Design a protein with these regions (language model features):
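ATP-dependent carboxylate/phosphate-activation module, predominantly the ATP-grasp catalytic core
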Residues: 1-55, 91-118
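C-terminal structural cap/anchor segments
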Residues: 65-126
Length: 130
């Protein structure tokens, strides 16, 4: 989840769904908020996601920090169902999730994936998901 901390408080910016390989970031899904929520709803309750974003906005105290931040979460298997680990880490900076949100479509066009690769230098690419 991506947020912004301002003098007026914390504002939810959007959901960021990303891929990892061996624990390292590899890319984000570029889709509307609704499409990402539908995808997450296959695994965890959307009410739970809403509660997490509301609790972060209402109760997280970042002291004097003002700016973008990301809350990394993880969906894990547990006893035949999926569970949400609601706070793996908090990144007090603009994250790749913020970049993905700025590139995400406004309508339900074809899903895309933003990926970072490295072969002598970093390369950002966007491709169709299917």
């Amino acid at each position: 989840m991506e947020f912004e901390s301002t003098d007026q408080g914390i504002r939810y910016v959007g959901l960021s769904l990303f891929h990892t390989r061996n624990g390292a970031y590899t890319g984000n899904i570029l889709a509307t908020e609704q499409a990402k929520r539908e995808r997450m709803g296959r695994y965890v309750s959307l009410d739970l996601l809403d509660t997490v974003s509301q609790q972060v906005a209402q109760q997280l105290d970042l002291g004097d920090y003002r700016g973008p931040f990301g809350l990394d979460m993880m969906v894990v298997r547990g006893n035949g169902s999926f569970l949400l680990h609601p706070c793996v880490e908090i990144n007090l900076r603009r994250t790749m999730g913020h970049v993905a949100l700025s590139l995400s479509p406004d309508d339900d066009e074809i899903l895309r994936v933003m990926q970072i690769s490295y072969e002598n230098r970093y390369k950002l690419s966007v491709r169709r998901m299917y």
